[in-house]
Amino acid sequence: AEIPPTFGVSSKMVQAVIAGGRRALTKAVEGAEDSTAAGARDLRAKRVTARDVVVGITASGTTPYVLGALGYARRRGAVTIALTANRGTPVGRAARITIAPQTGPEVVTGSTRMKAGTAQKLVLNMLSTTAMVRLGRVYDNWMIGVALTNRKLRERGVRILCQATGASVAEAERALRQVGDRLPVALEKLKKRVSGEGV
């Protein structure tokens, strides 16, 4: 949900499916993760192709739902990544790439939402940030694709322009107004002014 506003990309670029569907985000749907067919069905509904990357997330590395999803994605030619807390698992073997941060035993045995889940979230942040950098959605280390949809984000956009170009706050605000709050366009406009190419 944070990738489109942070990097200015379509919400279709990064999508998520979860065993049990959207309802599972607020209420446990017991047994939903036990179906390989459901994992495949949910990815089929997303129309996965060879142009996609599918990341299967499971701390144990044995979740049938994830196995089904990765199997379907692999058959469609997608790049498959297993993100698990254990090495040498069925999910790891089902994927082309395995990422298995070694977090050690949980504080509460079996409660993988703690260390394993936290490590997986960090890995997902690394994957998404790296992808957006590679796609040019970042200038130096500034998130120039950010959608300036509220006051806080607009102020951030102004700061980015000031830091990246040496423009004053007034110049940055004016540049944003002139281009309809499109931060990358304002950045190019101010860079040309600073380099003497004109506006």
Enumerate the predicted regions with their spans:
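Short, amphipathic alpha-helical interaction segments embedded in low-complexity terminal/linker regions
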Residues: 126, 131-199
